[in-house]
Amino acid sequence: MGICFSAGDVSSGLLIFSAMQQEDDLKALENIVQFARGLGVFFLVLHVYWYCYEWLSSCGLTYGYADRLLLDIQRTTLLFSSPVVTKLCAFLFLALGCYGTKSVRNGRVARRHIIAAACLGFPLFFLNGFLLSLPAGIGFRGWSYTLTLGAGYLCLLAAGVWLRRLMKQPLMDDPFNDNNESFLQEERCISNDCSVNLPTRYRYKGQWRNGWISVVNVYRSTAVIGLPGSGKSYAVLNNYIKQHIEKGFSMLVYDYKFDDLTRIAYNHLLRHLDKYAVKPKFCIINFDDPHRSNRCNPIDARFMDDISDAYESAYVTLLNLNKTWVDKQGDFFTDSAVILLAAIIWYLKIYDNGCYCTFPHAIEFLCQPLERIFPILSSYPELENYLSPFMDAWKSNAQDQLQGQVASVKIPLSRMISPQLYWVLTGNDFTLDINNPEEPKILCMGNNPDRQSIYGAALGLYNSRLIRLINKKGKLKSSLIIDELPTIYIRGLDNLIATARSNKVSVCLGFQDFSQLERDYGEKEAKVIINTVGNIFSGQVVGDTARTLSERFGKIVQLRESHSVSNENVTTSTNTQLETLIPVSKISNLTQGMFVGSVADNFDERIEQKIFHAEIVIDNDKVKAETAAYVPIPEISSFIGEDGKDHMEEIVKENYYRVKADVAELVLREIARIEADPKLSQLLPKKKQG
């Protein structure tokens, strides 16, 4: 009868054989260690016998055979030619014995104990030779030398054993897993006629390396995210401004803290005017200081083609004045306010060839009595259907409803009634088509954190009108740099990001985190902006923003080591695991100037490693020298009269009252026209018909 063995039996047998083989190997190693340690003690005994021979002889501890043997060894090997030779031999075998010791690992052994034992043992063991030449008795010299030699040997033995017992924990060398999470990054500088190139330093496997962030396709838009102080403007936005001016871009800069970015743009333009085929005009919108501001009419009749343009202008302005309206689209009072303001803007556009079509005129017209506003507006067929909800309430004498509808637009707009705002909004120093090949512009719009809710409405209107004008074919390449994006609402920004690439419009948006953008732009629009941006830079951010970015950067295969410590040895197992490339904790703890992110590439400019985690290198000395050489922004508008005095306040106020007078005169003319027409006169209140 045959004997059958199962696969399990064979496997168990192999494991038992392997364990037995391992045990035999350990026993053999232990024997070698004991032998090495014994040799060390043997050399130590030989050393004492040779160099303390006189003392041992007086004690009757010498032997003729041993004497002859040692003399023969000395003649052939010169082992005793110097005391250091035998000491080194003893020390060598001591070290081998300690290295191979199968000792109990103890994490509580401190390095200071090892250092103390070694510092005590080395002098006692190697530097005690002077004791043999002391002017003392032979017994004292022998005993003192032997005791110090033995004590030194024991101290060195203790240091060696403790060093072996000192449990080395490889994971503690990299407690934050920095080396394992480091990765090779792009080290080539890939440049083209629109790229932004930033030098970097990054760590890979514990070593600093030089790299480059090459944004070769700026037309796929860029988001620069980071908490205050993370270095967004200094490291990224400033470089976008400088490098795009150097490459001949027309530009819009939204300068939230005027004039930080404006000063950079102006001075850099002065140095690089030769990069433009047509010299660009440098324009500024600054409501705080009319001296340093151009004037521009954002609702210029020449650039409004139909009533939808008026609706967009009204919508943007009111949403900037009431950020909560972003989530109230479709609400009765919200839509009523937008429609009424849009109707007024379009009315001013079609009246007298649009000579009164400015936003201050629209505000002043809205402040007229209702019994004048509605008859005038409804007397135009283009607005009759547009205003039907208001006219129904007007004809049915629903005054409470009508007053509520009008108040919903009048109250927020009343905050914009300001002589300085009126001054800037009623002029025509330039047009908003900044990428016009015949008249390119560098336009800087300045806000003021103390008045951002008021200025933001006008600036949001400028920006919204501008992006509709520049996102067209056949224009110059242009760059939009928007710092602190949530402080203004720009309608159509999501559409611009999605379509601007074909029209050579670069968009660079700076903001603090995604939640801030969702609060001021609404969840849906914010998600579209976030998900359609092709290039992203992020400094330190926390919470959901850090988690979203970490997921966006994906995962990488990492090497994992597991250490199991026992009384016998340390067992190490190694495996690979798919882990997050840049974890949330890293993004949440980035230092100033360190950025993570990714870039988009082109068909003919491939970037294999698009993701980066690096410090953007800024030559601080060079930047300081450039800043020190900057010239101040000159006055754009002069209010100096013939008497040599500055009459800015008087001129600005005169313009303010002129707008009011224009509207009052316009209303009188329109009422007279309506009264003279039998059909239209029915639109007037009954008291007017008598």
Language-model region placement:
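Acidic, Ala/Val/Gly-enriched low-complexity intrinsically disordered segments
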Residues: A7-V10, A19
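Basic- and hydrophobic-enriched, low-structure N-terminal and domain-boundary segments
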Residues: L14-S230, Y234, N239, K247, ...
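P-loop NTPase motor domains
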Residues: A7, S58-L61, K168-M172, F176, ...
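Conserved ATP-driven motor cores of ASCE-family P-loop NTPases powering translocation/secretion/packaging/pilus
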Residues: I497-T499, N503-A600
